[in-house]
């Protein structure tokens, strides 16, 4: 058991080092997925021997260990293959190669620089969904890895795979799920694509899909941007209608289709800061922000730091905090709020301190990775 604990500690040290390094080198991300694979192999072996804990770590069930190890192996192999191509010279962040990004449409492809578009079903703005058009899609074809741009038409969002259009979002299928009339409108920036049956004139673009996508990203100013994708022969502009002024944000984070009335899917990438009260904001190490609020003096309270981020990162970080036990009173397990979307980066841990001095000393000494965010506060004292 002692040997397994030591190996697990070494793996988790490597994982946390990868988070803190925030590397843009693909070889570092290969090392990360190797460490994740090894971590889950250790968990699997421990569970096979009926061990439910390794040190202070709870051992997941066999099915969870196996599933996570398989994902790590799949991504490790894909990255090792991609590393042998000319694309290994590009910048790759950990969020570009994370599990959620890998399984976001188009699945089992690497993707970069997503642009949001809106689709209104049944012509109603209140029944709209959001989708992502990727500037770059990296897929493994018959001749190895290829880099292409995705584009949008009235039918859906697609990219060219081995000379053929591959739709990863089909608006007709989406309209069946979310609409009643089987019609929809596509809105991207100041341009719109409407149902061809609803107008008498037809607009055709002579610009190829790839050219249009690249042109869009080379003009990011809202007033001069060109639409992502191309208007196909079946798409039309409504005569006498001014372009919509909806301007979606450009982001690298990955989101799947959402509607106003439905929960949105989680983004793979975590933001480094929380939006807190700007009137009492401080800047902390790692780009985090904090918010001090007035506490009713009638209650006995303790200063705390809430740390938000991806669950596995927080677990590793909590483990590393044990080296600084003298700098805090206690630390919670990983948790999340139940009334919000349980996204990848919506997990929390809370660190409790005996006084403000101890908390400040903790923040000065303990290295906090930029991939998580901090919020300072106070909590009513509990048994500790």
Curated annotation (Swiss-Prot):
Transmembrane domains' residue ranges: none
Subcellular location: Host nucleus
Biased composition, class Low complexity, residue ranges: 251-263
PTM notes: Phosphorylated.
Region (Transactivation domain) residue spans: 1-200
Keyword Ubl conjugation set for record: yes
Primary location recorded for the protein, binned into one broad class: host cell
InterPro entries: E2/EBNA1_C_sf, Nucleotide-bd_a/b_plait_sf, Papillomavirus_E2_C, PPV_E2_N, Reg_prot_E2, Regulatory_protein_E2_N, Regulatory_protein_E2_N_1, Regulatory_protein_E2_N_2
Residue ranges with Polar residues bias: 220-237
Cross-link Glycyl lysine isopeptide (Lys-Gly) (interchain with G-Cter in SUMO) per UniProt, renumbered positions: 308
Biological process terms in GO annotation: DNA replication; DNA-templated transcription; regulation of DNA replication; viral DNA genome replication
GO cellular component, one term: host cell nucleus
Segments for region (Disordered): 218-292
GO molecular function, one term: DNA binding
Pfam families documented for this protein: PPV_E2_C, PPV_E2_N
Recorded family membership: Belongs to the papillomaviridae E2 protein family.
Biological function: Plays a role in the initiation of viral DNA replication. A dimer of E2 interacts with a dimer of E1 in order to improve specificity of E1 DNA binding activity. Once the complex recognizes and binds DNA at specific sites, the E2 dimer is removed from DNA. E2 also regulates viral transcription through binding to the E2RE response element (5'-ACCNNNNNNGGT-3') present in multiple copies in the regulatory regions of the viral genome. Activates or represses transcription depending on E2RE's position with regards to proximal promoter elements including the TATA-box.
Quaternary context: Binds DNA as homodimer. Interacts with protein E1; this interaction greatly increases E1 DNA-binding activity. Interacts with protein L1; this interaction enhances E2-dependent replication and transcription activation. Interacts with protein L2; this interaction inhibits E2 transcriptional activity but not DNA replication function E2. Interacts with protein E7; this interaction inhibits E7 oncogenic activity. Interacts with host TAF1; this interaction modulates E2-dependent transcriptional regulation. Interacts with host BRD4; this interaction mediates E2 transcriptional activation function.
Family annotation (HAMAP family): PPV_E2
Protein name: Regulatory protein E2
Gene: E2
